[in-house]
Amino acid sequence: MGGLSLLQLPRDKFRKSSFFVWVIILFQKAFSMPLGVVTNSTLEVTEIDQLVCKDHLASTDQLKSVGLNLEGSGVSTDIPSATKRWGFRSGVPPKVVSYEAGEWAENCYNLEIKKPDGSECLPPPPDGVRGFPRCRYVHKAQGTGPCPGDYAFHKDGAFFLYDRLASTVIYRGVNFAEGVIAFLILAKPKETFLQSPPIREAVNYTENTSSYYATSYLEYEIENFGAQHSTTLFKIDNNTFVRLDRPHTPQFLFQLNDTIHLHQQLSNTTGRLIWTLDANINADIGEWAFWENKKNLSEQLRGEELSFEALSLNETEDDDAASSRITKGRISDRATRKYSDLVPKNSPGMVPLHIPEGETTLPSQNSTEGRRVGVNTQETITETAATIIGTNGNHMQISTIGIRPSSSQIPSSSPTTAPSPEAQTPTTHTSGPSVMATEEPTTPPGSSPGPTTEAPTLTTPENITTAVKTVLPQESTSNGLITSTVTGILGSLGLRKRSRRQTNTKATGKCNPNLHYWTAQEQHNAAGIAWIPYFGPGAEGIYTEGLMHNQNALVCGLRQLANETTQALQLFLRATTELRTYTILNRKAIDFLLRRWGGTCRILGPDCCIEPHDWTKNITDKINQIIHDFIDNPLPNQDNDDNWWTGWRQWIPAGIGITGIIIAIIALLCVCKLLC
């Protein structure tokens, strides 16, 4: 009783203390502890770089699960490299996690592997598991392998992303992408009486009529899948293959496929024809495409740069078994052909162009055998391409090729249109400047120019180009599909329309700032990346590491954007300064010449009263501000020697809460004392 008597308070003081306790409790409810997450759509780039904490997690409804692709971190996406990241294990049950949104995938995979005895290596997909919905290229591989295990897992512990479902195992015959699962904290929406609640889509639902995209399929055959030494063959048609022995890009395979069809280097028997790539051939064209070829637009695989050479002919003992016969060959690289030999030496002053009456249909990228191109769009997109197919006297003949992607997939067994006799001449794919140069008058040295004649007008559609290319739906629509950096992430998770952005063509393999998101229609905006749940077959840290790679890619993209903006502003400042200087000099010169008539203003009147103001200091200050706030600021310290009291401000709400709890306990003891 002696101890309790010390806690007794007068009735008026008790009321004041109780009121103070309730105020503290309500204050703690209203101001929760921050979780260290980037905040709303109005954040600045410096806030992202410094990871400023401004938002609070009030409820679990603010969390949104997002699938992040590993290719955004710069991993190799070709089939030989990707298969080395997958392995079979037994005794580990698969895990499936649902997520709500995800990135656009540049490369997806589809596997159908059998054991030597003919049984399936991979399990069938469970009910509700559908293919990844946004794939630019689908690498469809068939083959055999030992498959030493029940399931195929990711060796690094990553997920295999399907349609709104992420699994730790590969399922048979379903498109998937490699990735991890992260969570975004969304800004809490403000609810009003006049605003209806948002309509949420089902978790496993991806239909979005506003998104148009093209998916291309590349087919492979793999021998000894899952083993240390395996063989991968790229399928041109049912009997023609290319052995892949180095990292490559899908763009290289597409160019190679068209070149083999163009040179008619297909198997002309029922046996197999396997081509091997020479070591000098560059297989990295179009790296980091992400819906656009941004590495080097002039770096293409042209037909005249390759030569085909037969190596050996291996036949079985039974000559009648033609189907088992294998012919081998090599695709070599040779010097680039000069286009000057296309112009005749004894040509007149003008080389006219005309379109021949008979069109020659060449195997285009959408009509070749061995792959299918499916376009999921409600529109029909047509493009006419022009290609020089040979010379005829003093005229260059151009054959128009119509490319019309349709919503249905072109079967791989479709026959190739037989070329006309004109197509037997050496075929050359030329770039725009090379072809247009032939329209100018050309006179051989040492010869007198002949009489000038008018060239016939070349009437072609406006969209005629000089190279056959795949027409993507997003190239013909005003609303693009590419979103990048933080603005793209925040906008793509909301209801705003996305716009396409041209990115740097010199992006290295370690930095890929192009993150493209597909998502259900939500009214929320993404606030930032918070944390990743720990799932997987047991590789520690893979998910956190994967998220940090993607976050670093965002920071890398922002820094790269700031560098480019600063350089552009500096060039613009230099140009405007020089232009202002030249303008003032010219004005003085004109005034000097017109001084006998009273000068320029006496002649022009009030129209000459224009002063080229000097804004150099303003632009320089803005450039220095960008450099100071964004480029020169170092990244947060990644060392592990952080002081335990570094974030002491974050302990203030916790201290207030603990103090409130202690006071509440004391108040309850006082109440009990009074009642007793």
From Swiss-Prot:
Gene3D superfamilies per record: 1.10.287.210
Gene Ontology cellular component annotations, sorted alphabetically: extracellular region; host cell plasma membrane; membrane; viral envelope; virion membrane
Span list, region Disordered: 337-373, 404-461
Post-translational modification: N-glycosylated. O-glycosylated in the mucin-like region.
First and last residue of the signal peptide: 1-32
Keyword Transmembrane: yes
GO-annotated biological processes: clathrin-dependent endocytosis of virus by host cell; entry receptor-mediated virion attachment to host cell; fusion of virus membrane with host endosome membrane; symbiont-mediated suppression of host innate immune response; symbiont-mediated-mediated suppression of host tetherin activity
Protein name: Envelope glycoprotein
Phylogenetic lineage: Viruses, Riboviria, Orthornavirae, Negarnaviricota, Haploviricotina
Gene from which this protein is expressed: GP
